[in-house]
Amino acid sequence: MELKKQAQKGTIISEKFIEPENYRVILLNDDFTPMDFVVAVLISIFNKSQEEAETLMFKVHKTGQASVGIYVYDIATTKCFQVLTAAKNNNFPLQCKVEKV
């Protein structure tokens, strides 16, 4: 994205804005975390609807993983940390990872 400004003496100044890179948060399947907990995580951390959360949970269960959102780096890593913390606090081995898009 580029913005152009005109300085006081007629000089045009060009400012370029670099778009931040996007990162995908991926939820990983395991054999111990209850499906209801995964749905609750998707609703509370990723703001998914009940229907979206259930669809994603089944995708994780059937394929081993699913992308649950794309965010800038800081938000992606924060959400992944929130998932890991919630899982640990509830004694579940649920894992997630962050990958550059």
Swiss-Prot record:
One GO process term, biological-process aspect: proteolysis
InterPro entries, alphabetized: ClpS, ClpS_core, Ribosomal_bL12_C/ClpS-like
A Pfam entry, by short name: ClpS
Classification via SUPFAM superfamilies: ClpS-like (SSF54736)
Covalent S-S links between cysteines: none
Superkingdom in the source lineage: Bacteria
Family: Belongs to the ClpS family.
Role this protein plays: Involved in the modulation of the specificity of the ClpAP-mediated ATP-dependent protein degradation.
Complex formation: Binds to the N-terminal domain of the chaperone ClpA.
Name assigned to this protein: ATP-dependent Clp protease adapter protein ClpS
Taxonomic lineage: Bacteria, Pseudomonadati, Spirochaetota, Spirochaetia, Spirochaetales
